[in-house]
Swiss-Prot record:
The keyword DNA damage does not apply. InterPro entries: Aldolase_TIM, TAL/FSA, Transaldolase_1, Transaldolase_AS. Pathway: Carbohydrate degradation; pentose phosphate pathway; D-glyceraldehyde 3-phosphate and beta-D-fructose 6-phosphate from D-ribose 5-phosphate and D-xylulose 5-phosphate (non-oxidative stage): step 2/3. The keyword Cytoplasm applies. GO terms for cellular component: cytosol. It is an enzyme of class 2 (transferase). Homodimer. Keywords: Cytoplasm, Pentose shunt, Schiff base, Transferase. It comes from Shewanella woodyi (strain ATCC 51908 / MS32). This is Transaldolase. Transaldolase is important for the balance of metabolites in the pentose-phosphate pathway. SUPFAM superfamilies: Aldolase (SSF51569).
Length: 318
């Protein structure tokens, strides 16, 4: 019998949730995703020193202002790591817009254009890039405009049905509904333990998947943020799942039989009118878990972006 990972690959597209090139080589995923926290982690890997140096030297040619150099070096480093990953994966890389732009539609669009330009200058077509944006109202509106320009987006930090519905209605290419972070919140809030089938994160992604398929939305559902392989097994059949190296390793060393759990609807019905901004904000606000986890996720990504910039600034001024 094939191992659990190989069985899973025949049902669901596996995406590596890491910036570690060696891990990506080991598990041979279709795509890869990065975020500010993963870029910060990758920047500590000695084999990546040349990518950092290249970003530093490039940034120095772009501006004489240190703050602009730091910003440019951060963007260039994220792209440099993405370019290396694209030498291995046959599909796409997701590169994230600065979390501090999560409530700035125009700023998010401008940053997306800059990242795409950097990839194109490195010989990478935009068809291999997904621009990651937080699933705020502003992020979703930015993604809608980018999609209309032919720039595909990955809407992340997605914790609620309201966010998922708004993304589909905006014509977003892909969403990353978080599983493990939803579980974390409910375990802390209730003090209970949950089986994989009852896991609130699994239930949330299943609801989103079924809604999309029932109403004929083309937006790809890519479950993210897993705490254990049980969550992953329960989402077999989801369009894609992005999984970290530790859980990929566990799946590769397991013989657990994989049975498809998510199955698309055979017939579709038309969805209702799109959510207005007021409706979105109200529905989202009614979900305390989603409100807390989105805010926390944005803050934490911004903190790690700041840590990366401190490191880059030291190198730029040394």
């Amino acid at each position: 019998m094939a191992n659990t990972l190989e069985q899973f690959k025949s049902i669901t597209t596996i995406v590596a949730d890491t910036g570690d090139i060696e891990a990506i080589k080991r598990y041979q995923p279709e795509d890869a995703t990065t975020n500010p926290s993963l870029i910060l982690k990758a920047a500590q890997i000695p084999d990546y020193a040349h990518l950092i140096e290249n970003a530093i030297e490039w940034a120095k040619t772009q501006s004489s202002q240190i703050d602009q150099q730091v910003e440019d070096a951060g963007d260039k480093l994220a792209v440099n790591i993405g370019v290396e990953i694209l030498k291995i994966v046959p599909g796409r890389i997701s590169t994230e817009v600065d979390a501090r732009l999560s409530f700035d539609k125009a700023g998010s669009i401008a940053k997306a254009h800059k990242l795409i330009k950097l990839y194109q200058e490195a010989g990478i077509d935009k068809s291999r890039i997904l621009i990651k944006l937080a699933s705020t109202w502003e992020g979703i509106c930015a993604a809608k405009e980018l999609e209309q320009e032919g720039i595909n987006c990955n809407l992340t930090l997605l914790f609620s049905f309201a966010q998922a519905r708004a993304c589909a209605e905006a014509g977003v290419y892909l969403i990353s509904p978080f599983v493990g972070r939803i579980l974390d919140w409910y375990k802390k809030d209730t003090g209970l333990e949950y089986s994989a089938t009852e896991d609130p994160g699994v239930v949330s992604v299943t609801e989103i998947y079924n809604y999309y398929k029932r109403h004929g939305f083309n937006t790809v559902v890519m479950g993210a943020s897993f705490r254990n392989t049980g969550e992953i097994i329960e989402l077999a059949g989801c369009d894609r799942l992005t999984i970290g190296p530790a859980l990929l390793e566990e799946m590769a060393n397991s013989q657990t039989e994989v049975v498809r759990k998510l199955i698309p609807a055979e017939t579709t019905v038309e969805a209702g009118e799109p959510l207005t901004e007021a409706q979105f904000r109200w529905e989202f606000n009614e979900n305390p878990m989603a409100v807390e986890k989105l805010a926390e996720g944005i803050r934490n990504f911004a903190i790690d972006q700041g840590k990366l910039e401190v490191m880059l600034k030291e190198k730029l001024t040394s």
